[in-house]
């Protein structure tokens, strides 16, 4: 078992597990030779606050991207939909909502709906999902995924056929506002389309942008080679990278349109990237489906890159796994721990936000884990 939790809480956790006689103890890890840049997450995850981050009564919350506003408050943009229609209906019922807190650890309070349905004639007319919030030159810039369909908004779990139909329509777009409260300017076209016949022929999803000081942007995205129903026989998921002279576009793919290269994870299924820039490098945290890099399935890894195309992993690439240490001393293996989003302040990751589900699927919400100071600043 790898040590992911911060040292400041380790002694307490070990004492707690020893005194209670529980078998679920933490094991020490032999230190490895330091590398640069260091993995800012491994061994630096502090306890997750019980009751922190964002839970919405009667609703599923899936993921959350947080930014500090000019007023010093923290604004979370999250995907949410009624729990009555089940988890599957993210694809038809997801909407991006705003929640606010005075602390990056929450609890966040629901404020309003950010990008409401606007009609099936629009590419993002019926659902919005995967928010990633950024700020540049006084503007709040929200990257997201949208899709559309030409039937009534579902009030119960949709069929597999309907799921596949709407999934195939996923595209990345961007909206802009002067305030986190809006109003938001949306656009009639997505910023990046799939390319039938190539590795990214099905969708564009999971936007992970860096907006540079001059307003240009680098965008890592997820795609798949074929849409449904062919996707049922080909489940590949990979990352590509594009750039634009301005974050609104136009975007063109780098690396001759080929997928990016992650050392040690070639041909592995990956999703949910988040990237930031510090010290002349791009940094990434993302989910990997296999145990190839981290030793546990459906966990997270850290990588870095000079150009956004070739990514290197450190000696210990693990960023997180599904075991979460809470401030009450409990360690819970979550059913899901996905969509890692990072709050970066002064070039350093300070908090990780996750879409999570408890072991019984009884609560699906956003969870925050503080990160011990250090890392990439």
Where are these regions (language model features)?
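Sec/Tat signal peptide C-region and signal peptidase I cleavage site
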Residues: 19-22
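Carbohydrate-active catalytic/glycan-binding domains of CAZyme proteins
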Residues: 24-377
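Positively charged n-region of N-terminal signal peptides that target proteins for export
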Residues: 1-4
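Bacterial N-terminal signal peptides
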Residues: 6-17
């Amino acid at each position: 078992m790898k040590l992911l939790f911060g040292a400041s809480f380790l002694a307490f956790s070990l004492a707690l597990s020893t005194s209670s006689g529980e078998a679920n103890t933490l094991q020490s890890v032999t230190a490895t030779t330091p590398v640069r840049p260091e993995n800012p997450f491994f061994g630096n995850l502090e306890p997750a606050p019980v009751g922190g981050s964002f839970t919405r009564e009667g609703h599923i919350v899936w993921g959350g991207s947080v930014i500090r506003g000019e007023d010093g408050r923290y604004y979370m943009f999250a995907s949410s939909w009624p729990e009555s229609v089940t988890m599957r209906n993210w694809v038809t019922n997801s909407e991006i909502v705003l929640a606010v807190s005075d602390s990056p650890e929450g609890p966040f309070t629901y404020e309003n709906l950010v990008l409401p349905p606007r009609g099936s004639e629009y590419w993002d007319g019926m659902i919005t999902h995967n928010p990633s919030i950024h700020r540049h030159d006084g503007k709040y810039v929200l990257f997201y995924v949208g899709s559309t369909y030409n039937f009534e908004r579902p009030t119960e779990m949709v069929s597999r056929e309907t799921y596949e139909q709407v999934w195939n329509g996923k595209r990345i777009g961007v909206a802009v506002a002067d305030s986190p409260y809006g109003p938001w300017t949306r656009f009639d076209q997505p910023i990046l389309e799939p390319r039938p016949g190539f590795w990214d022929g099905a969708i564009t999803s999971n936007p992970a942008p860096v907006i540079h000081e001059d307003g240009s942007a680098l965008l890592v995205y997820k795609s798949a080679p074929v849409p449904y129903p062919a996707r049922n026989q080909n489940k590949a998921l990979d990352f590509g990278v594009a750039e634009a002279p301005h974050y609104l576009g136009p975007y063109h793919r780098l690396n001759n349109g080929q997928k990016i290269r992650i050392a040690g994870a070639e041909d592995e299924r990956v999703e949910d990237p988040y990237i930031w820039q510090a010290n002349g490098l791009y940094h990434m945290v993302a989910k990997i489906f296999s145990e190839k890099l981290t030793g546990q399935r459906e966990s997270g890894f850290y990588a870095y890159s000079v150009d956004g195309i070739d990514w290197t992993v450190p000696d210990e690439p693990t960023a997180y796994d599904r075991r979460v240490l809470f401030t009450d001393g409990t360690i819970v293996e979550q059913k899901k721990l996905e969509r890692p989003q990072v709050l970066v302040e002064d070039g350093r990751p300070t908090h990780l936000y996750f879409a999570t589900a408890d072991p019984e699927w009884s609560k699906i919400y956003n969870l925050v884990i503080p990160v011990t100071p250090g890392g990439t600043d």
